[in-house]
Amino acid sequence: MKLPIYLDYSATTPVDPRVAEKMMQFLTLDGTFGNPASRSHRFGWQAEEAVDIARNQIAELVGADPREIVFTSGATESDNLAIKGAANFYQKKGKHIITSKTEHKAVLDTCRQLEREGFEVTYLAPQRNGIIDLNELEAAMRDDTILVSIMHVNNEIGVVQDIATIGEMCRARGIIYHVDATQSVGKLPIDLSQLKVDLMSFSGHKIYGPKGIGALYVRRKPRIRIEAQMHGGGHERGMRSGTLPVHQIVGMGEAYRIAKEEMETEMARLRGLRNRLWNGIKDIEEVYLNGDLEQGAPNILNVSFNYVEGESLIMALKDLAVSSGSACTSASLEPSYVLRALGMNDELAHSSIRFSLGRFTTEEEIDYTIDLVRKSIGRLRDLSPLWEMYKQGVDLNSIEWAHH
C-alpha cells in the first residue's frame, strides 16, 4: 500500500491506463492527428470517425441519441451553456429560474450572472438530509418560470435527487429542466430515453477520463433550443464552436465505454467500501453523517467530527488525500456552503471531511483510513479545551466568548 492514500475521487480521478493508451493514438504524426472538420482528406475523415465513435459511446452510457451530445471543455462550460443558452433563448416566455442552494458553483455563479442581466432566480433550501422537498419546488414554479436546474448527485455530500419526478413536474408545465450529472454519470444508471430531462451536463475527469473535456446533452424530441455562448465556425451543430480536441474526446468516449461495462460491479464494490468506512468510524463520539446513506451515491461519505477543528484534522490526516468541501472552494477557510444550506452550524461544518472513493481504492486503504481517523480524532480532542468542557457537561452554546 502506497501513502498518501487518494480519497478525493470527487475532485478528480486518475486517467484509466486504458484511456491514456487510447488517447496516445490521436496525437502524433503516426497517429490520427487530423482536424475532424477537414473534409477534403483522409486525415480529417479518420479524426471525424473517431469523434463519432466517442459520441456514440457517451450516448450509449446515458441512453441518448448521439446527435444530442455536444462536446464542451468540461462540466463548468456545459452548465454555463445550458443555463445561459436556454435562458437567453426562452427569455421572451419568462425570466424566472429555479435552482437549489447546494448546486455546484458552476450553476450558482451562472445564475448569479443571469440575475445581473435581469433574470429572477429562486434558490431552494434542501431538507436536513440534502434532498429537495418537491412540494417546495412545485410551490416555487410560476407562469414565467422557464428553467429549473437541479443536480443529480451532490459533489460534497453525495445525496441523489429525484430527477425523474422533477422532470415530470417540469415537463407538465412546459419548463425546461437542466441536470448537472457530473458526479453521477457512470456511477448511477441514467436513461435519457426515459427521463424527462432536457439538458444534462457531463465531465470526463470525474470518471477516469482526461481533464478539459465534457459534454452537454441537448434533447431533440421535444426539441430544446439554446443560444450559443462560443462563436466561430459553427461546430457542434452551431451550439459550441471550436476545433474538436480529438484525443480528449476519444479519451472521454473510452472512459464512458469502460464505465458502462464495469458500473454495476464497481458500484457494488464501492458501496461496500464506503459502508465499511462508515461502520469503522460511526461509533466515535459526536460524529455526524452529512447527507443520506440510503439516498446517497455509493462512493461519497461526508462526516463531521464535533469539537475538532477542520484544518487541523486535515493536517493530522496528511497521509490521506481528503477534502473539506469541494475542490473549487477548498482554498477558502469559509465553511462549506452546502453544509450550511443544510442548516448546520459553522463549527460542525468546519469539522467536516469528505471521503470519496474510486476505482483504485482498496480494502486495505479503507482499514488504514479507519485506524488513522480514530487515532487522530482522539489525539486532537485530547488537546482541545472545548472537548474537555463538553465532557464536563458545559453547554458550549450558552457561553459568551469575549472578543479581544
From Swiss-Prot:
Protein residues bound to pyridoxal 5'-phosphate: 75-76, 155, 183, 203-205, 243
Entry keyword Iron: yes
GO molecular function ontology, one term from the record: 2 iron, 2 sulfur cluster binding
N6-(pyridoxal phosphate)lysine PTM sites in chain numbering: 206
One CC-aspect GO term: L-cysteine desulfurase complex
Enzyme category, top tier: transferase
Source taxon at top rank: Bacteria
Main location: cytoplasm
Active-site residues per Swiss-Prot or TrEMBL entry: 328
EC number: 2.8.1.7
Name of the protein this chain belongs to: Cysteine desulfurase IscS
Natural source organism: Salmonella typhimurium (strain LT2 / SGSC1412 / ATCC 700720)
